[in-house]
Design a protein with these regions (language model features):
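Short acidic/polar active-site loop segments enriched in Thr and Asp
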Residues: 2, 51, 108
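Canonical Radical SAM [4Fe-4S] cluster-binding loop centered on the CxxxCxxC motif
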Residues: 2-32, 105, 115, 119-122
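Conserved, mostly hydrophobic/aromatic
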Residues: 11, 37, 55, 87, ...
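Conserved glycine-rich "GG(E/T)P / GGGxP" loop and the immediately following alpha-helix
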Residues: 21-27, 46-79, 85, 90-101, ...
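Hydrophobic alpha-helical membrane-association signature
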Residues: 33-37, 71
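A short, N-terminal amphipathic alpha-helix
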Residues: 37-48
Length: 122
């Protein structure tokens, strides 16, 4: 099985329990990161079809709609035959527009980060 993982290190807030590589969301950083992703794909000549694509983080759902669409456009050459296309989401950064965008870009699996069901602990 051929798999591709794309790390989106941006978060709206930094959680004390998280050990993953992450930084605060800033629009200009996201734009530079997406441009660097394009460069890396071209420079390393990454190609081919993948069985699974997983977009993790950080909090990928913290990106705005235009940034998410740019990310999906960047990854589209690798998702033509994908069986499982996953993105990590935080319920705080989700809305119907993002869900629609995910569906329109063939996301077929969400990984929802639930640390607690107690509001006072969030």
């Amino acid at each position: 099985m051929k798999s591709l993982y794309v790390h989106i290190p941006f978060c709206d807030h930094i959680c004390a329990y998280c050990d993953f590589c992450k930084v605060f969301y800033k629009t200009e950083w996201v734009e530079k990161y997406l441009d660097a992703l394009v460069y890396e794909i071209q420079h390393k000549q990454i190609s081919g079809n993948y069985d699974t694509v997983y977009i993790g983080g950080g909090t990928p759902s913290s990106l705005n709609l235009l940034q998410l669409q740019k990310l999906f456009d960047i990854l589209s050459p690798f998702t033509k035959c994908v069986k499982e296309f996953t993105i990590e989401v935080n319920p705080e950064s989700m809305d119907q527009e993002k869900i629609d965008l995910f569906v329109n870009n063939s996301i077929n699996r969400l990984s929802v980060g639930v640390q607690t069901f107690q509001d006072k602990l969030l």
